[in-house]
């Protein structure tokens, strides 16, 4: 061993060899660190770094399963783009969370910082009108559906315009418009109605869709309305309505409360409550177009 050491010293290689060993060791440590981090990101545990939402799919248009809080941890299952599929440690719940809410150092989508409705064309369809009065209440106020769908659409139009959206109305006054003539092109179509039944017990909001391409918009708007509105949430449902069937764009039909229910009717008549629902619709559209 002494002979080897003497030979290395004689030829000036001892210091070089030491340097090479140190360099190799440093490279090894770097590779080990990268491997550990990669393994943790690909198959390990992730931590939520700020309050977020667990969703049924990998973008903001999917419905929320439940809210998750900063500090919670999950098992990572998969990744699509900037969205991470996770499972709770009990193995009872799976869903998707935006990667920028986790410790994986994924940058947020740039679209989230801009206005997602700017330049979008939203078609608002106030149900009924003119000789077609729609549903009516049995209370002394005798509320007519056609009047409140138009009020809601006009108020909603103002909110959407403030967000930079271009709004088309199938009617802007009390006139009859056929279902065929309500087929107007845009980026999204929203038909506004109030429900009614012979029984005064039925109540709440229902969001209808028909074609598969319409379901995501329906679920997003339903989730947004559920967060803010005081009305009972009846969910999103598939229904073969002509205004949904005849269009090729994302479209929904909103039944914003039962005019035949006294409690719902009072909220439909209340401008402040309508504004809450209208803002929820705007929020849902922003969320839908951000995905």
UniProtKB/Swiss-Prot annotation:
CDD domains hit by this protein: MurNAc-LAA
Pfam families hit by this protein: Amidase_3 (PF01520), SH3_3 (PF08239)
EC primary class: hydrolase
GO molecular function: N-acetylmuramoyl-L-alanine amidase activity
InterPro entries linked: LytH (IPR017273), MurNAc-LAA_cat (IPR002508), N-acetylmuramoyl_amidase_3 (IPR050695), SH3-like_bac-type (IPR003646)
Protein keywords: Cell wall biogenesis/degradation, Hydrolase, Secreted, Signal
Domain MurNAc-LAA, residue spans: 122-286
Function: Probably involved in cell-wall metabolism.
Name this polypeptide is given: Probable cell wall amidase LytH
Chain's gene name: lytH
